[in-house]
């Protein structure tokens, strides 16, 4: 039954990608935000998220936390809608939406052939960090968590390897060995600090 559900999810996402690609970047991103806010709470119960925010003392009151959760879902909706346009970020058609700060630091890393660890989190379109680093000339490998939906995971892996970062490291024990291999080859590593890793 899970395979059937995954297949239908895959069909829905592929259909949305097709529609978003027809709408153009800005319109698709804005509509994606609305879709995220509308359907996000159906995917994951807001009560647990609100409870976690309160436990972490984030937001002054319930209203503030509700706004934060709504914006979170909107952000995920935008990210979903922007996947069909990742290739355009790569080939500079959408570069006007990206501001790269610290280019001199990247130039130093390249010039001195340093191996460093780039750390970010799931802010806005988190895929763009690795894309911009590799595009700037950094020898890079990025750690990723495979999706549970194996139908959709193949699509996402293809997008990541083709347009974001050629060297993708699957999190876990085997990934730990790959990280060491890339570091020995003087590659830098990109990772998300808030990524769930229970092994390796």
Where do the language-model regions lie?
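Soluble catalytic domains of membrane acyltransferases
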Residues: 87-200
């Amino acid at each position: 039954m899970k395979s059937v559900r995954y297949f239908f999810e895959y069909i829905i996402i592929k259909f949305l990608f097709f529609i978003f690609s027809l709408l153009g970047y800005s319109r698709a991103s804005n509509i994606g935000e609305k879709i995220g806010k509308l359907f996000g709470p159906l995917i994951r119960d807001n009560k647990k998220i609100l409870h976690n925010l309160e436990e972490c003392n984030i937001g002054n009151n319930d209203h503030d936390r509700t706004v934060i959760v709504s914006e979170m879902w909107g952000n995920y909706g935008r990210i979903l809608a922007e996947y069909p346009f990742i290739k355009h970020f790569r080939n500079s058609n959408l570069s006007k939406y990206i501001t790269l700060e610290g280019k001199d630091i990247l130039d130093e890393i390249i010039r001195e052939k340093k191996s460093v660890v780039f750390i970010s989190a799931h802010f806005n379109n988190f895929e763009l960090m690795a894309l911009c680093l590799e595009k700037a000339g950094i020898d890079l490998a990025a750690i990723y968590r495979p999706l549970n939906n194996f139908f959709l995971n193949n699509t996402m892996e293809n997008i990541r390897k083709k347009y974001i970062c050629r060297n993708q490291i699957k999190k876990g024990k085997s990934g730990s060995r790959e990280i060491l291999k890339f570091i020995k080859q003087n590659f830098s590593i990109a990772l998300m600090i808030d990524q769930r890793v229970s092994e390796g």
